[in-house]
């Protein structure tokens, strides 16, 4: 025997001796001594330390020292009352500064299930293994320590270790090496025995008991030759055996019967240790990952080991499950002649693997609770678990499993090999059987399964005959989609990707039919493709967790399939896809966002949005149509009519009092509207007496200026002498309408309704929660109506018209035919001003202007030779289109406001008076600042050769 020859030598007396084992030297990164002062020790502990040191000195484990190195030493008392000496080697163990680590020789515990079943066992424990292994002579001084003297009354005593000190970084590795060398001859001679060695614990198994005894006898001799000793009181020869804290029976392996203390679980470190211990025995217990999710969740958050943690009720239930499994769980010792198989179960959260032999459970296999990737497909998890467990089986027995059983059909397995890189890696070089038939046993029935293994709703190819929807998101928090319909969603996120994720979720919720989704975010596309069957990695970002979970729930709840793909944004490529994506991008542009925000605050109308922001008519209409308040309050409009109007700002006002009950004491709303510009001013009052009217008018003067004329109803506050005196002081003329007939006040009556509607919109559907008082609410409504809204046939706001006198009608100054209802004839005139449903016409030089409905107007578009015939409806038919059709020809398709100020009742057309006409004519001439008669020449030409002196001469000459 070569090994025996190496160990045995012949002395000069002729007797055989045993050569002592050769020490293993340590590698040091520095030769600079490390000295850590010894701290003072109590008298009792100091006495115990002296006794222990003398004992170790007698055994030859330590020796006196004068080393420049020093490590503190201390003692602890065991439950038995005996003392134990320990050395604080933390400074010496500093990996990056002092000592070179050797690395572990046994990185994991051996599986006891690999011990052949029914084989007899012997288990031994080496006594004081570290103290029987010598240190290299040059390393001894590095492990010196000092025993101090009380009050320094005598010199301290110093020693250094000659054997492996407990607590040294490389002591376990050196111990494993020494014991392994001692056992090598045993393994070589008894190769058919099964021997497990871990640190200083040794297990021997043999098929026959006689063989086991022979192996044990030889092992005793080899251990003694190596200078090691067996603890005689720890030899086990009968069941149940206890090894590596597990209980071994003839065919079963059971975990230790322990109870988990919950009262000590207070910090992250406590829970980390607990879960580390549970994970150590999970391959035996068989607790799936999903059954410990709440315990794993406690580890999230602050990484400080002392940070506080609390045991939740759900986690308490999971600890109880662990305790129950500890009491009942068991695995089986194997038959060395039978192959192993791997079963993959599609459990919730992540798949579970089981190593079996026939129907006997050998070991459980699980994936970590947390993954590296944000989304991990379930199929990829299965592939990872297969690869992981295959390596485990090869490590246990040296062979691949004979069969792998998966919850997939043959076609699904074939597709997995084609499409999944993870599947190809997990099953690389596997030559066994892939099956989907599970053994019939009750062992696995408690597992909670999932059906989300492969996608059911998500498609990898575009759907035919399906709607196509484009999505987009912006960093301003807006998400949108466009397709059969458009929608813009305001989100709380300041990330374009998260906003786009909201857009995709909204599309999946809004379209209950097959759809193709096109997004310009590759991140969102990939997430949506994978989320159906994916395990979502937990993130410290709660918002992101909520979004991903909502996306997964939305996809899984769908009844119809969808396909999603990526398109590059902001390219110059031609085609409908690029244009549609640009349209989706416009929906979340800053201009559109600002328009949405303004409408949410003020409920401005479509034309106002179009005028103020760079948005299309369709986008402006969509904003108003998607507003729930504006939809409810979109009232039908009446046919337009005519009330006398001013021809310039502050020429003619109408004034009235309306009521808003929600304003309480201030429910009397005094309203004034300028009939030229439609500028509105209103104040909240506690009544409608003359004093309240005067107070309101003074407020109007401060904002609008002083009018020339005011028209009111016949209320007491307007007919009093005090009010007449007030108007006289301000040089304002006053007229009233027909008693009990509101048609003469149609403009202000409609204004009342407009104002009330706007108040309701802003109160129930606006973002203006800071407007709490009645006057604040009223001011916001007035701001919207005056400075934001634009009405049909207008190009500017009421405020701009009032302040600048700018005209709105594109027809002003045009030559027209107008119908004289008294004479039933058509006359030629010139438009002074034009509104929706009304117009003011100048019949000719030195004639008062006439207010008429637009249905009595015709455009003059060709000359007529006979002047007398031209004025008769019987002799000449006007050759022109109607006003309404002309509006369309001029492209005036702007959407009217729901409650536009100028939509008065047509029944008020007859309210025109000669006095009003005269005033209007005067105002018009003064406002124009033009005394040249040519301004009102019948032909309408500024360079009329007749100077506009005679309409008939003008017609005959200019024609």
UniProtKB/Swiss-Prot annotation:
Q: Gene for this protein?
A: ERVK-19
* Pfam families tied to this protein: IN_DBD_C, Integrase_Zn, RNase_H, rve, RVT_1, RVT_thumb
Give me the residues that bind Zn(2+), please.
Answer: 599, 603, 627, 630
| Organism superkingdom | Eukaryota
Anything else of interest in the record? Answer: Exact N-terminus of this protein has not been formally described.
Q: What is this protein called?
A: Endogenous retrovirus group K member 19 Pol protein
Instruction: List all membrane-crossing ranges.
Output: none
Q: Which stretch carries the motif LPQG? A: 164-167
Native organism: Homo sapiens (Human)
């Amino acid at each position: 025997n070569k090994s025996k020859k190496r160990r045995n030598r012949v002395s000069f007396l002729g007797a055989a001796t045993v050569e002592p084992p050769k020490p293993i030297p340590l590698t040091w990164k520095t030769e600079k001594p490390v000295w850590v002062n010894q701290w003072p020790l109590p008298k009792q502990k100091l006495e115990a330390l002296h006794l222990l040191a003398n004992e170790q000195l007698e055994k030859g484990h330590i020796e006196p020292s004068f080393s420049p190195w020093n490590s503190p030493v201390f003692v602890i008392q065991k439950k038995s009352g005996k003392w134990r000496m320990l050395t604080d080697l933390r400074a010496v163990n500093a990996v990056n500064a002092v000592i070179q680590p050797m690395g572990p020789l046994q990185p994991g515990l051996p599986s006891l299930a690999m011990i052949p079943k029914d084989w007899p066992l012997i288990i031994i424990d080496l006594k004081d293994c570290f103290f029987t292994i010598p240190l290299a002579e040059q390393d001894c001084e590095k492990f010196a320590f000092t025993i101090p003297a009380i009050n320094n009354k005598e010199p301290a005593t110093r020693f250094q270790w000659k054997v492996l000190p407990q607590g040294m970084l490389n002591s376990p590795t050196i111990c494993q090496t020494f014991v392994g060398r001692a056992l090598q001859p045993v393994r070589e001679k008894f190769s058919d025995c099964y021997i497990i060695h871990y640190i200083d614990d040794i297990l021997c198994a043999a098929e026959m008991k006689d063989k086991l005894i022979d192996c044990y006898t030889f092992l005793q001799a080899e251990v003694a030759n190596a200078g090691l000793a067996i603890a005689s009181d720890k030899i086990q020869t009968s069941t149940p055996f206890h090894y590596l804290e597990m209980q071994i029976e003839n065919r079963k392996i059971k975990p230790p019967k322990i109870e988990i203390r919950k009262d000590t679980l207070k910090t992250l470190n406590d829970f980390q240790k607990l879960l580390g211990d549970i994970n150590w025995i999970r391959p035996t217990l068989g607790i799936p990952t999903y059954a410990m999710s709440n315990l794993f969740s406690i580890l999230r958050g602050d990484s400080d080991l002392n940070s506080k943690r609390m045991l939740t009720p759900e986690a308490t239930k999971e600890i109880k499950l662990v305790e129950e499994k500890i009491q009942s769980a068991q695995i089986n010792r194997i038959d060395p002649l039978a192959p192993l198989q791997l079963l993959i179960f599609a459990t919730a959260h992540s798949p579970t693997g089981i190593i079996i032999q026939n129907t006997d459970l050998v070991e459980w296999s699980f994936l970590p609770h947390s993954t590296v990737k944000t989304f991990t497909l379930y199929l990829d998890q299965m592939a990872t678990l297969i690869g992981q467990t295959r390596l485990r089986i090869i490590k246990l027995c040296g062979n691949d499993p004979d069969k792998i059983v998966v919850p997939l059909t043959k076609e699904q397995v074939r597709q997995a090999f084609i499409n999944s890189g993870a599947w190809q890696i997990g099953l690389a070089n596997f030559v066994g059987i892939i099956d989907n038939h599970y053994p019939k046993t009750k062992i696995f029935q408690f597992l909670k399964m999932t059906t989300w293994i492969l996608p059911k709703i998500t498609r990898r190819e575009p759907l035919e005959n399906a709607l196509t929807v484009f999505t987009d998101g912006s960093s301003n928090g807006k998400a949108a989609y466009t397709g059969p319909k458009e929608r813009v969603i305001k989100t709380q996120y300041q990330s374009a990707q998260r906003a786009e994720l909201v857009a995709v979720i909204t599309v999946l919720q809004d379209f209950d039919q097959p759809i193709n989704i096109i997004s310009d975010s590759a991140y969102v596309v990939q997430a949506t493709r994978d989320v159906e069957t994916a395990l979502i990695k937990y993130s410290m970002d709660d918002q992101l967790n909520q979004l991903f979970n909502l996306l997964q729930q939305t996809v899984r709840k769908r009844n119809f399939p969808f396909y999603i793909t990526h398109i590059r944004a902001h390219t110059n490529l031609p085609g409908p896809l690029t244009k549609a994506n640009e349209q989706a991008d416009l929906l979340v542009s800053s201009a559109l966002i600002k328009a949405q925000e303004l409408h949410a605050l003020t409920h401005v109308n479509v034309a106002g949005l179009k005028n103020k922001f760079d948005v299309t008519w369709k986008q402006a209409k969509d904003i108003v149509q998607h507003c729930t308040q504006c939809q409810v309050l979109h009232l039908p409009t009446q046919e337009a009519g005519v009330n006398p109007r001013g021809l310039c700002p502050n020429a003619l006002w109408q004034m009235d009092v309306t009521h808003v009950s929600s304003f309480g004491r201030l429910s009397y709303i005094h309203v004034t509207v300028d009939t030229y510009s439609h500028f509105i001013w209103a104040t909240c009052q506690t009544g409608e007496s003359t004093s309240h009217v005067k107070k309101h008018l003074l407020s109007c003067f401060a904002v609008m200026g002083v009018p020339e004329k005011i028209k009111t109803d016949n209320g007491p506050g307007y007919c009093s002498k005090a009010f007449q005196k007030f108007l006289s002081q301000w040089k304002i003329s006053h007229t009233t309408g027909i008693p009990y007939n509101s048609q003469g006040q149609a403009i202000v009556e409609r204004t009342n309704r407009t104002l009330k509607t706007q108040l309701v919109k802003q109160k129930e559907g606006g973002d203006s929660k800071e407007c709490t008082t009645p006057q604040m609410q009223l001011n916001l409504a007035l701001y919207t109506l005056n400075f934001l809204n634009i009405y049909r046939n207008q190009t500017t706001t009421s405020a701009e018209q009032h302040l600048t006198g700018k005209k709105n009608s594109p027809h002003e100054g045009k030559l027209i035919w107008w119908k004289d209802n008294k004479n039933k004839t058509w006359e030629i005139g010139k438009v002074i001003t034009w509104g929706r449903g009304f117009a003011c016409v100048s019949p000719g030089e030195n004639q008062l202007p006439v207010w008429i409905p637009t249905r009595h107007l015709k455009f003059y578009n060709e000359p007529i030779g006979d002047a007398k015939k031209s004025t008769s409806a019987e002799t000449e038919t006007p050759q022109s289109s109607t006003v309404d059709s002309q509006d369309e020809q001029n492209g005036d398709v702007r959407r009217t406001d729901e409650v536009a100020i100028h939509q008065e009742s047509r029944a008020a057309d007859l309210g025109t008076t000669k006095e009003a006409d005269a005033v209007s004519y005067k105002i018009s001439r003064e406002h124009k600042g033009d005394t040249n008669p040519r301004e009102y020449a019948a032909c309408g030409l500024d360079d009329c050769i007749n100077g506009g002196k005679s309409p008939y001469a003008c017609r005959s000459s200019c024609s």
